[in-house]
Amino acid sequence: MTSDDGNAGQEREKDAELIEVGGKKVSKTSTGKRKFHNKSKTGCDNCKRRRVKCDEGKPFCKKCTNMKLDCVYSPIQPRRRKDSSSSKFASAVHDRVGKKNLSDNAIMLQQQQQQLHHQQEQQFRQQQQVQLQQQLLPHVGTDEQSNSPNSVPPSVSNNMENLLLPHLLASLVNNTSNSTNSSANGAEAHNNITQTAPSSMINNNHPNMALPGNSPLSIPITPSFQSTAMNLSSSLNGLLSPGRLNSVTNGLQQPQLQQQNQQIPQQQGTQSPFSNIPFDQLAQLNKMGLNFNMKSFNTLFPYGAANGMASEFQELFGLGKFATSNNRAIKVSTAEEALANMQQEQEDKNKQFTKNPLDNTKTDAVNSGNNPLNGNENKVTASDILSHNKNLIIDNTGLTISPPHTLSKPSIDQNIASPSTGVSNVTSTKSLLSIPDNRTALGNSPTLKTSPMGDLLSNSEALSPRSSNSHTQQQSSPHSNASSASRLVPELVGLSRKSNLNLIDLKLFHHYCTDVWHTITEAGISGPEVWSTYIPDLAFHFPFLMHTILAFSATHLSRTEAGLDNYVSSHRLEALRLLREAVLEISDDNTDALVASALILILDSLANASSSSPTAWIFHVKGAVTILTAVWPLSETSKFYNLISVDLSDLGEAVINQSNHNNDNDNSNNGDGNNNNTISELVCFDESIADLYPVEIDSPYLITLAYLDKLHREKNQLDFMLRVFSFPALLDRTFLALLMTGDLGAMRIMRSYYTLLRGYTTEIKDKVWFLDSVSQVLPQDVDEYSGGGGMHMMLDFLGGGLPSMTTTNFSAFM
């Protein structure tokens, strides 16, 4: 080794900072891998990637040829010199600051543009509203033709709500005191309204109407203003939104607003006292026989029906022309929701039957000492109840198990439902089903074993088979002796298996056609031709009606025969399930079926009032009434048109009968006192509420007292039962609001109604069988009602937990 080589080695050792480890010299910074390789900077790409020496043969190097690789020579790129880290950091900071400044400038510019656009838009809107007000002023006169909604131009009517609402509210607030300080501008009216929000309602004329809560009320809220505020809730929400305050309080509008505020009290001086009544109450009074002119009031409230007006019975009281397009959808949704709650409650009740079937059996209604039944005969499982609903349609060739909704108006002989033909016509109808006669497979079917007859079938094997003649004799005299009466249901179960017939349901349908329908007509609900022929025939077209009939018939038969409680529950549950589907598809074809089902459900709820909690029947009655609400209005071709559309809407007829003479002289007699403001035809019928008479025309109790007066006058009419139990569903929203907020006057009126209801049920319970049960759960005094007395009882009656009547939804129209 030469000296030069030795010097070079020493230099390399110094450069690499070699240290000696284990007798070997290694680099201090070595990682254990080769730091350098023999690859050529000008070699092919494959050799560079593999870090091997390339012979640089072109176009193919030797290594790529041996390995059968594509030899590629990429052009040599000059290496970039790295900039110092300090300069890079400085440039990055500079770029960041520049971008931030640019973004800030852009944001400021955008905000300025938005503000400018908003100001321009606001000025344009103000100018447009000033023009609209100038066009509107001639239409606020007293001329009837110019005041009619049809005479207002479309451009004006679209903004009428925004322009008139603040002044209407201001005039209504100051009307009772005849204050001369009503010339405040739009901003002052708005401040007064917002400062006196009804967290507590105070009535000067009715001190008992104060609500709990502390609120700096600077303006007394009269009954008329209270109900008006409810009916115009949606308009207030839109008016008091932040985006619309500027357009109300702008200085350009103040001269016009002051001019209108001065004109409106002057016009009120010449108006009839009827103009203070909310729109919904006014229309109801007009239906009852109050023949005053409504054109001036329609001008003030052109959108009354669309903004919060009580919509449940608009068509019932003659407000169909004001109904909105979504009125039916709202009522259908409410009915479907109520039926869903009823269905859920019925399912929970059926689960209780499953857990403890013997304790829930209604054996006390059947002379349990004379008609004992074995425990096994009464025991029915949950699967029995569910699958029983599928066994309804019967043919003389066999039995099928199919969902009830498959029945969609089959061609049926018109003589099926005739009371004289009884069950024989039903079993001889071959157009209902097409079933293969496979009795062996049917007998072994697991579905049949889980029917309501399933558990009883094993116990019925010991029953001796009987001929059809002996069975007919057994049905003709079910009460011949205690032993035969107690064995009727198990015997029918056994015969159903032997003959492949569901004789229980046949027996229930026959029982309705021969016995039950008489009890409905005797209660004054429609005529015999409806319930004896029309409804049974209609039940074959609509399964929900069939299940409703069978449930009601089972309830009636269970008073004399034991073992039918589970049939009542299962048929009612299936009827509710199918009604939920049917109420979403209301048509002229199924209207009568829905009305009949609702009426039967009401009667069935009354008949089973004592079998559950004391308030459960109220929940079911209210839910059934929602079906009647959903099908409104009924067509004149309906069998129930005279019963529902005329009788129920006639509750207040002739109660209020102001003469046309008073209407013609409203302007001249306006200052004569309160003679024109009271209803002389309403006579006190209960001394406990005598202080509420005479009833003023703007009283929040007017409609309710008119209904009760009508009920007392026509107590002996045949249809009184349906009227008295449907009364809570007909309450107007103003009275409902007072009742739900604890108004003492409203509670006293409902106590009077309860006294009427209690006295009526006690009087006729021996004549009408389905009122006997409800008379047992009604306390002697309404204050003894579980939960706190009259208000709680009536709140149950008015909703009982229905979502449509909860306080959450109630706040929507407060």
Curated annotation (Swiss-Prot):
Q: Keyword set for this entry?
A: Activator, Cytoplasm, DNA-binding, Metal-binding, Nucleus, Phosphoprotein, Transcription, Transcription regulation, Zinc
Q: Where is the composition biased (Low complexity)?
A: 146-159, 367-378, 473-485
**Where do the record's region annotations for Disordered lie?**
1-42, 140-159, 344-378, 401-485
Q: Is-annotated flag, keyword Metal-binding?
A: yes
Biological process (GO) annotations?
A: positive regulation of ergosterol biosynthetic process; positive regulation of filamentous growth of a population of unicellular organisms in response to starvation; positive regulation of sterol import; positive regulation of transcription by RNA polymerase II; regulation of transcription by RNA polymerase II
Q: Where in the cell is it found?
A: Cytoplasm; Nucleus
A Pfam family found in this protein is: Fungal_trans_2
Loss of function: phenotype: ECM22 and UPC2 (in combination) null mutants are not viable.
Q: What residues are annotated to bind DNA?
A: 43-73
Summarize the protein's role: Transcription factor involved in sterol uptake and regulation of sterol biosynthesis. Binds to sterol regulatory elements (SRE) with the consensus sequence 5'-TCGTATA-3' present in ERG2 and ERG3 promoters and regulates transcription of ERG2 and ERG3 in response to sterol levels. Seems to be involved in activation of DAN2 and DAN3 cell wall mannoproteins.
What remark does the entry add?
Present with 79 molecules/cell in log phase SD medium.
Question: What is this protein called in UniProt?
Answer: Sterol regulatory element-binding protein ECM22
* Species name: Saccharomyces cerevisiae (strain ATCC 204508 / S288c) (Baker's yeast)
